[in-house]
Amino acid sequence: MDLPTERSQRVHHEWSLRYVGLLFIIAFLRTMAYVEVFLTDKLRPKVKDDVKVTKIWFPSREKGRYIKAFIYEPISMPSGPRPVNINVHGSGFCSAAFFGNSRWFNYCVASKLQCYVIDTDYRKAPEHPCPLPVRDIEDAVQWVLQH
C-alpha cells in the first residue's frame, strides 16, 4: 500500500560556508554511492523466489508522516513466534543511495534464518540532522513491537 508521504519540515540551517561545504561533500558522496549501486547491481548473484518482498509505509511519531520500508518474508516460514531483523542500512545517516541496496543481504538473512527482515528508509543528514534518523529507527522498532 503506497501512502503519500509528507516531507517533514526541514530544520533551518544558517547558510554558513561550513554548511554549504557540507552540502557539497554530501552531494559528492551520494553521487558516488549511486554510481557504486549502478555498477555492482549487475554483478550480484540472482536471488531465489523463496522470499516475498512487500513495500510498506508505517506511521512516524510525527503526525501525517510515514516511513518507507521493505519487508522480506520467507515463503515457507514456520508458524509460531517469528523473529524479526531490522536492517539499518550503512549510509552513515547521510546517503540515500543505500536504502534497498542491501536487498541480496536481506534475502539471504530472511531465507537462511527464517525471519522477517525490515529494511527501513530513515531520514538523512544534513537535511535532517541527528537525532531525527535515530528517531525513525526507534519508530520502526515500535511499529514492529506493535505488530
Predicted region positions:
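Short beta-to-alpha linker loops that shape the active-site pocket of alpha/beta-hydrolase fold enzymes
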Residues: 75, 91, 121-125
